[in-house]
Amino acid sequence: MNRGNVYSVSSVNQYIKNMFSKEYALSVVFVKGEISNCKYHSSGHIYFSLKDDRSQLTCVMFRGDRGGLDFRMENGQEVVVGGSISVYERDGKYQLYAKKIVPVGDGHLQEPVSYTHLTLPTT
């Protein structure tokens, strides 16, 4: 058996995270989906998933980014989430890091299919 190079788990996760960070298309994304598994953590962070009829995406909004949220999130709500996709190295999982969350259909959006006017807060 020819093993080739052997890497640590940390090295692989770090490499993949670096690949994600170099991909511009993942640095500013807007994703539409239904909220599920929403948890407001005592730290102030919000952990949730976005889902559609075929897939699910793990998401987090950190306490410092909650200025981009002006409503209380609940399971079952349809939203558009703006942020970036990256890898959480410790667990080796990719997720959406939310900066802005807008409910769909409550007057925040003038045109239901056009989200180009949404902008992410600068940090």
Language-model segment annotations:
Residues K39-S43, R90:
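Short, conserved beta-turn/loop elements at beta-strand boundaries and strand-helix junctions
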Residues L57-D70:
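Beta-strand/loop nucleic-acid-binding surfaces
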Residues I46-C59:
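OB-fold (S1/OB) nucleic-acid-binding surfaces
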Residues T116-T122:
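Conserved small/polar residues in nucleotide/adenosyl-binding loops
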Residues V29-I35, G76-V87:
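OB-fold and OB-like beta-barrel modules that bind single-stranded nucleic acids
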Residues S86-E111:
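OB-fold/S1-family single-stranded nucleic acid-binding modules
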Residues V9-S27:
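Short boundary/loop segments of OB/S1/cold-shock single-stranded nucleic-acid-binding domains
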